[in-house]
Regions:
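Hydrophobic alpha-helical transmembrane segments in multi-pass integral membrane proteins
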Residues: 95-103, 194, 200-252
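Membrane-interfacial, low-structure loops and terminal tails that flank and connect transmembrane helices
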Residues: 6-59, 116-149, 233, 513-527, ...
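Alpha-helical transmembrane segments of multi-pass inner-membrane proteins
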Residues: 38-83, 91-115, 151-168, 177-183, ...
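Transmembrane alpha-helices of multi-pass inner-membrane enzymes
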Residues: 95-110, 403-410, 530-591, 600
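Membrane-interfacial loop-to-transmembrane alpha-helix junctions, especially the N-terminal start
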Residues: 62-69, 186-197, 233-246, 292-297, ...
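Hydrophobic transmembrane alpha-helices and their immediate junctions
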Residues: 405, 495-541
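Long extracytoplasmic/lumenal interhelical loops at the membrane interface
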Residues: 425, 431-447, 451, 455, ...
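Aromatic-anchored transmembrane helix interface
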Residues: 214-215, 239-251, 260-283, 292-301
């Protein structure tokens, strides 16, 4: 086995030169193979059963599904009106009317086609793109030898479900149908679940502990592991994974040994959501998948931004700008919305940058403007400071030398506030502008959290808001916040100083990797996505100086997915470059600009 020096590990690649002039990633690919008997043997019979089920569902005529959905919706409506007529209802619930109508409206288009479901979906341009291009579901082509379920069976199932919906709440039956469809599509394609999570992410504010989100991620991981075991997906194990697993292990230890069951549950949730890095880093294997991921985030941001703008207009007309605390839209707090919009604005700017079609550029420019307006109405003015830092980070990546160091300095520059001497801090506290911006309040929170960290240096105080509040009560009675308000400080307080070192190692590898690797692939389209993910990471690090960016579990998951996307796109860009160099058989062509090919 090859031995690597510490600087090679931190740099992210070895110094060995390949015959085509490319550098070699320090990574290992893992996939299903004949020598992995425990995986392939276990999944062999299950895979055959699932493939048979997939074949039946795919080749069942669309008319069967239309009959099932239409009969279920229409008959449910009739049965509930009968219940209203005989006096079981004062009035038919609005929820019943909506659910029944939705199923009827969905079912009617399916009644118009006799083609198998998979073929019918491929025949329509919109559904073909959504299911088979965007969500990467495997295409099933027409096969007359395959027989599905007849329409008569669909009608019978629709009647049975409608009767069941009259006995139990209809929304429960509808939810079970939706959940089964979601599970099937998830196990059919892990990309479906992975991308759909981003679309629903803004609407998970009810899931304050992140448990529901963790369940969705766990299902995606199981589907992805199944594909890896069958040899249909690849897992990339790199030095980032080592640092991530160390950090997650510290979170687990803190969750188990420090503050009981609640802390343990929170740690398990954080571990599962941290696997967003693994999913993004391994599922994204080409530019199309990278664009799908970024588009999923952008798509989900548009309705949220519109809601935030409307909410702000209503609130400002009522209380005025001076008393307006900021829009939160579907999120629980304005600063959480600001984090999400920082990511979506950056990705929409990326598409404005790389798209050549003028109409598409205008569309993404409009989305950028809408998101930017919504970001302003969060009243999180530190977010605009981070946008300036992001612009500097983007420019730094164009430097031929020293860009990694500049990225690191931009990330930690704001933390120099922690080094201000105590007497000077007192002067800063007295400044009216500083008080208005809340900086003095933040510094006081940091000082209290530092005392707590000093006494819980290695194991931390436990995971979650409850653990933090329980421990901080031993140091002050005048603390009305659920965290320290600083990203790195809060990570250290909750999971111990080793978790901070592990995260620092991950980040150091990224900026070193990005700084040295950028000139090698600087004109690759996929590399541009990686550049923007680096910009986002730097911005979130800076934004985290005065906000704990992982307080909301959706943003914690989003952070690791964006970070994983950066790793994946670097790897893909490197592979594309090496393949082009090998194709042109010109080992002297060190600059990719002379032979760059736009991969679509």
């Amino acid at each position: 086995m090859a031995k690597y020096t510490l600087i090679e590990i931190i740099s992210g690649y070895t110094s060995a030169q390949r015959s085509n002039g490319g550098k070699k990633f320090l990574s290992q690919t893992v996939t299903g193979s004949a020598n992995r008997v425990s995986i392939t043997g276990f999944s062999k019979h299950v895979a055959k059963l699932f493939d048979k089920l997939t074949s039946i569902i795919s080749y069942t005529p669309s008319r069967t599904y239309g009959a099932l959905l239409t009969v279920f919706g229409a008959l449910s409506l009739v049965l509930h009106f009968i219940k209203d007529y005989i006096g079981l209802y004062e009035v038919v619930p609005l929820r019943v009317l909506i659910v029944s109508s939705v199923f009827v409206l969905i079912g009617i288009p399916f009644l118009l086609s006799e083609k198998p479901l998979s073929v019918a979906l491929q025949s329509n341009r919109l559904t073909d793109y959504v299911f088979f291009e965007f969500f990467c579901i495997r295409r099933m082509h027409k096969n007359d030898s395959e027989k599905g379920i007849s329409a008569v069976v669909g009608v019978i199932l629709g009647v049975m479900l409608a009767i069941l919906g009259a006995c139990v709440p209809l929304w429960i039956v509808a939810s079970v149908i939706g959940a089964l469809a979601y599970l099937f599509l998830t196990f059919l394609s892990p990309e479906f679940s992975f991308f759909s999570i981003f679309i629903v992410m803004p609407y998970l504010s009810f899931d304050t502990e992140g448990i529901f989100l963790a369940i969705l991620v766990a299902l995606t991981l199981v589907s992805y592991a199944r594909k890896v075991g069958l040899g249909k997906r690849v897992y990339f194990f790199e030095q980032y994974d080592v640092g991530l697993f160390i950090m997650l292990f510290c979170i687990l230890i803190s969750g188990i040994f420090v503050k009981g069951v609640d802390s343990f549950v929170s740690s398990v949730v954080m571990i599962l959501l941290g696997m967003g890095y693994v999913l993004a880093g391994s599922l994204v294997t080409n530019r199309r998948l990278a664009d799908c991921l970024t588009n999923a985030i952008i798509i989900s941001s548009v309705p949220v931004s519109i809601i935030a703008i409307v909410e702000s207009a209503i609130e400002l007309s009522r209380v005025g700008l001076g008393s307006f605390s900021g829009a939160s839209a579907t999120f629980d707090k304005p600063y959480t919305l600001a984090i999400f919009l920082l990511v979506s604005v950056s990705f929409s700017v990326y598409f404005v940058d790389v798209r050549r079609n003028r109409a598409v550029k205008v569309l993404y420019a409009f989305i950028t403007a809408v998101n930017f307006i919504a970001l302003f109405f969060t009243m999180s003015f530190w977010a605009f400071g981070t946008l300036i830092v992001g612009a500097l980070a983007f420019s730094a990546q164009k430097m031929r030398h020293g860009s990694g160091l500049v990225l690191l300095l931009l990330s930690i520059f704001a933390y120099t506030l922690l080094l201000v001497p105590g007497q000077l801090r007192d002067v800063i506290y007295a400044n009216d502008v500083v008080r208005a911006l809340g900086l003095s309040d933040s510094m006081q929170r940091w000082e209290t959290a530092f005392l707590m960290l000093r006494d819980n240096l290695f194991l931390g105080v436990g995971i979650g808001d409850d653990s933090f509040l329980e421990e901080i009560a031993n140091y002050t009675t005048d603390f009305s916040y659920t965290n320290s308000g600083n990203f790195l400080l809060e990570l250290s307080c909750e999971a111990g100083i080793i978790s901070l070192f592990a995260f620092g190692l991950i980040y150091l590898i990224r900026v070193r990797h990005r700084g040295i690797y950028q000139p090698y692939i600087k004109n690759s389209h996929v590399s541009k996505i990686s550049s923007y993910t680096t910009v986002i990471t730097v911005m979130l690090m800076v934004y985290g100086v005065f906000n704990y960016i992982w307080a909301d579990m959706t943003m914690y998951y989003l952070f690791w997915c964006v970070f994983g996307l950066g790793s994946a796109t670097l790897r893909v860009a490197k592979q594309e470059f090496d393949d082009r160099v090998a194709y042109f058989s010109d080992g002297s062509a060190e600059d990719s600009s002379s032979i760059d090919i736009s991969i679509r």
